[in-house]
Amino acid sequence: MRIFISTGEVSGDLQGAMLIEALKRQAALKAMDLEIVALGGDRMAETGVSLLGKTPKIASIGLIEALPFIMPTWKLQRKAKQYLQENPPDLLILIDYCGPNVAIGKYARKNIPQVPILYYIAPQAWVWTTNKKTTQDLVNITDHLLAIFSEEARYFAQKGMSVSWVGHPILDRMAQAPTREEARQKLGIKPDQTAIALLPVSRKQELKYLLPVVCQAAQQIQEKLPDVQFLIPLALEDYRSTISAMMEEYGLQGTILDGKSLDALAAADLAIAKSGTVNLELALLNVPQVVVYRLTPLTLWIAQNILKFSVPFLSPVNLVVMEEVVPELFQERATPEQIVQESLDLLLNPQRRQKTLSDYQRVREELGEVGVCDRAAQEILDYV
């Protein structure tokens, strides 16, 4: 079976790699030959698939922020479309990455209509959408959706899409996570030392808009807790020099960790994190967190006043139960002072900390059961 997979972002690369490994396992059980070509990143490349192009470095959120990546994205899109036209796969799998993947899906539906399109991890149109067109586009291009949230499955089923709920793949990843004690031993952190994970960057724009404010907050926390150790997992090697320079500028006691993100999360007493999949990882590890995010003022104004964009929450942890489990500091609220206030309260207030851990249990119950990637892989291989 020949499969083409398309995804973007650092998180999409991770989800894609986990799915590919599961596809290989399930194909071996069925004695099925498998050939996979993909758009993705380094993690997917490490699985041994043929990578047509790398997408994580050209990922962005926001309108103005996306401008520098329009041409690289367009070139990669053109390359993918040409490949699909010349080498139609048996199956096309799209993973999240709304704009580019919808464009690829539309092209495939029109030019190679015989190829089934499966969407794994749909864009969050079930939470937000600027208009009904986003949802309708997804319905039009998708033969079957493998949903990771139960509400996602209900939403798209109501719109007429063929859907199955497989659960969230983060459960499979976190099943391999070390305990707090194991992670601290591996990283050389004393059992009683305060450790804080800083997770502000997975996209280039966040080096400018998020990293400085998080480092300023970390500096203030360090002044109040002199023994604190900061742990910064590296999303992409390209970001190392900027992060290192920023840590030096603010005199932060910490370590940049390459390839040890789960160790950093598991070892932490608290995390200061951008909104994204990492919020769910922290919840599953019972690590309290402060979620922060910033866009350019112009992007925010356009989104609110022209596109009429609104969303109840930013973090998937809060979206899963539709209430604030973790504090979200967005835009003008994402100040060093606010971050410090929320962080110290979560660290030093036992009642607040226990409430967070209790709420995490409710989030966990909404994510399904371990074995997500294998269930998804079985459905994919049985589809054709």
Curated annotation (Swiss-Prot):
This is Lipid-A-disaccharide synthase. One of its GO terms (cellular component) is membrane. It comes from Gloeothece citriformis (strain PCC 7424). It comes from the Bacteria. It is an enzyme of class 2 (transferase). HAMAP family: LpxB. One of its GO terms (molecular function) is phospholipid binding. It holds the Pfam family LpxB. Condensation of UDP-2,3-diacylglucosamine and 2,3-diacylglucosamine-1-phosphate to form lipid A disaccharide, a precursor of lipid A, a phosphorylated glycolipid that anchors the lipopolysaccharide to the outer membrane of the cell.
